[in-house]
A protein has these predicted regions:
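Beta-strand/loop-rich accessory regions of lumenal/periplasmic or secreted enzymes
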Residues: 2-186
């Protein structure tokens, strides 16, 4: 597969090259994202226009690639740090700093999947199976370990895990009750 980055350091395109038998075939090109991933900061003045700096590649090894982008707006700035692993996992840290007193209404990351890559769903309260046409009604619940969602099909998909600075990986199986997730600070 291939990941292409937008100027802000977030994925603009994720392409899977697998056939129906789950065999790699470079002649097949199936897009996972319908639109580039968007990081949005909404203030009382409206949506902040974040202008990205040039992508700075910090480190590259045979197994990882790390980069950084600074996003500057009129009232806030954000730092996007990313590390891509050999298996396609990308860990992002998005840190937002107010440049002056500002009322923030919402901070969100928007992932628009293609129909191809959103046949099945699991997480955020959905037990797994075909993706419903309705909106998912979800709220943080530390008992239910609902901090992630996966959308995809047999050949492609994407899992998004929500973390903050106090994130602690949940325990599984018989230890489930002893390792509940923590509410995020924000």
């Amino acid at each position: 597969g291939t990941v292409k980055l937008s100027a802000d350091g977030l994925p603009a395109s994720i392409v899977a090259n697998y056939d129906q038998a789950n065999q790699l075939d470079r002649s097949i090109s199936n897009e996972v994202l319908a639109k580039p991933v968007a990081f949005v900061v909404e203030t009382s003045k409206g949506t902040e226009k974040l202008k990205p700096s040039k992508i700075e590649f910090l480190k590259q090894t045979p197994a990882t690639l790390e980069w950084k982008v600074l996003l500057k707006g009129s009232d806030v700035e954000a730092e996007c740090l990313a590390k891509m692993l050999f298996d396609g996992t990308i860990n992002y840290q998005l840190k937002v700093t107010a440049l002056r007193d500002v009322q923030v209404k919402d901070i969100r990351t928007v992932f628009d999947y293609t129909h191809y890559a959103s046949k099945y769903i699991m997480g955020l309260g959905v037990k797994g199976g075909a993706r419903p046409d309705s909106t998912i009604d979800w709220k943080w619940d530390t008992i239910k370990q609902q901090d992630r969602i996966w959308l995809g099909n047999v050949n492609a998909g994407m899992q998004v895990v929500f973390k903050d600075s106090n994130y602690k990986r949940p325990l599984v199986n018989i230890y489930y009750e002893f390792g509940r997730i923590r509410y995020p600070h924000s």
